[in-house]
């Protein structure tokens, strides 16, 4: 078992990582091969379009590394579904867009591997909460039952 030196978490554009900051400094300070990571990451995420991809890079004592890509952030997927550039300036006071419950379910299905639940309904409620906190209205959501 190799000794772990560092675990670096970054959010990078799919297929477009470069050795420039934030990648270079984050990996360089731990002695990992930056170009090797950039090539491997870009190859692994080339088919994901223009999404932002969270990645967790584990760097070992022998300067080798492994990385795990996660699903794009909920906020990115919600903005994409609502066709927005960014969330509300004053969430709760202003609504900047709306998404349907069906879109929420689609996002929840996509995010399932990274969420701490196996229940699609619970995952959808998490996504709906994220949407509301961004000032995006969720249309057609079922009534919430008190637990």
Swiss-Prot record:
Q: Which GO terms describe its biological process?
A: translation
Q: What does its PTM field state?
A: One or more lysine residues are methylated.
Could you list this entry's UniProt keywords, alphabetically sorted.
Answer: Methylation, Ribonucleoprotein, Ribosomal protein, RNA-binding, rRNA-binding
According to the UniProt entry, its GO molecular function terms are: large ribosomal subunit rRNA binding; structural constituent of ribosome
Q: Which GO terms describe its cellular component?
A: cytosolic large ribosomal subunit
Q: Which Pfam families match?
A: Ribosomal_L11, Ribosomal_L11_N
What assembly does the database describe for this protein? Part of the ribosomal stalk of the 50S ribosomal subunit. Interacts with L10 and the large rRNA to form the base of the stalk. L10 forms an elongated spine to which L12 dimers bind in a sequential fashion forming a multimeric L10(L12)X complex.
Family label: Belongs to the universal ribosomal protein uL11 family.
Query: What the protein does?
Result: Forms part of the ribosomal stalk which helps the ribosome interact with GTP-bound translation factors.
State what protein this is by name: Large ribosomal subunit protein uL11
The species this protein was found in: Thermus thermophilus (strain ATCC BAA-163 / DSM 7039 / HB27)
The gene it comes from is rplK
């Amino acid at each position: 078992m190799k000794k772990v030196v560092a675990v670096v978490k970054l959010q990078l554009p799919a297929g477009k990582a470069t050795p420039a900051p934030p990648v270079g400094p984050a990996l360089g300070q731990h002695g990992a091969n930056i170009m090797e990571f950039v090539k491997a990451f870009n190859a692994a995420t080339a088919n994901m379009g223009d999404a932002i991809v969270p990645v967790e890079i584990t760097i070992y004592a022998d300067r080798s590394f492994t990385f795990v890509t996660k699903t794009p952030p909920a906020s990115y997927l919600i903005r994409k579904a609502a066709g927005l550039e960014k969330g509300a300036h004053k969430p709760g006071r202003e609504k900047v867009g709306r998404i349907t419950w069906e879109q929420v379910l689609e996002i929840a299905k996509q995010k399932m591997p990274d969420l701490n639940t196996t229940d699609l309904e619970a995952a959808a409620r998490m996504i709906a909460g994220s949407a509301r906190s961004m000032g995006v209205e969720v249309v057609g959501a079922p009534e919430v039952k008190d637990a």
